[in-house]
Design a protein with these regions (language model features):
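N-terminal glycine-rich FAD/FM-binding segment characteristic of electron-transfer flavoproteins
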Residues: 1-237
Length: 237
């Protein structure tokens, strides 16, 4: 109850880097708030998935392992999060600002009538004073993101509704293992109790994925130029 939750995106049986980055940040937020960090993994063939997740300081991992949960489709994953959150009542939920996160986040937020800030670049814990009503809110999630075309940086808070939800851009948080031997609880849940048969109305027949030619996110130095460079030879240094 009232913990920090991270939705883990899974490609096959591998947790996405953006989710591991959010687990790192989620652990820090949970330490500040004095609560637990919990994670959600939903997919197919997830035996041993806790080995990837628990070292990031996860106190409880909720595992939904069943055919039809991978590849990702909207309705089953939405039902899982909405129904789980009604039970667990988290105060914060984080997910990646990816194709999946941008689809899933608004669906869950709308179903729970909670606030969602998209494409955050920074997350902090702080106090908010509602001067109009004379109310001070403690330990709110500061959801920080560029606004108005990147001309300003906005800090957004959600004082009333829970969970406070945010999607976070990949690569802006640092991925760090908290404790390689961290002992967390693994809870294996029955997806049938959270997802109805009608949620599986969409079936993925085939997927065509193009591999990235260069790992820009993992580069320590990036050299960029426009049309003025003339040719690729002019990039030689």
């Amino acid at each position: 109850m009232n913990n920090v939750f991270v939705y883990c995106e899974i490609e096959g049986t591998t947790v996405a880097d953006v989710s591991l980055e959010l687990l790192t940040k989620g652990r820090k937020l949970a330490n500040q708030l004095g609560c637990q960090l919990e994670a959600i993994a939903a997919g197919t063939g997830l035996a041993g998935i806790e080995k990837q997740v628990l070292p990031y300081g996860v106190d409880k991992l909720h595992v939904f392992n069943a055919p039809g949960l991978f590849p990702y489709t909207s309705l089953p994953h939405t039902s899982i999060l909405v129904n789980l959150f009604k039970e667990e009542k988290p105060q914060i939920c984080l997910m990646g600002a990816t194709v999946i996160g941008r689809d899933l986040g608004p669906r869950v937020s709308s179903a729970l009538t909670s606030g969602l800030t998209a494409d955050c670049t920074q997350l902090e814990i702080g106090t908010h004073e509602d001067k109009k009503n004379g109310i001070t809110y403690e330990n709110l999630l500061y959801q920080i993101r560029p606004a108005f075309g990147g001309n300003i940086v906005a800090t957004i808070v959600n004082p009333e509704c829970r969970p406070q939800m945010a999607t976070v851009r990949e690569g802006v948080m640092k991925k760090e293992i908290y404790d390689p031997a961290y002992k967390g609880e693994v809870v294996k849940l029955d997806p049938k109790k959270y997802v109805s048969d009608t949620d599986f109305v969409v079936e993925v027949i085939d997927r065509q994925m193009e591999k990235s030619k260069a790992n820009v996110k993992g580069a320590s130095i990036i050299v960029a130029g426009g049309y003025g460079m003339g040719s690729k030879e002019n990039f030689d240094m």
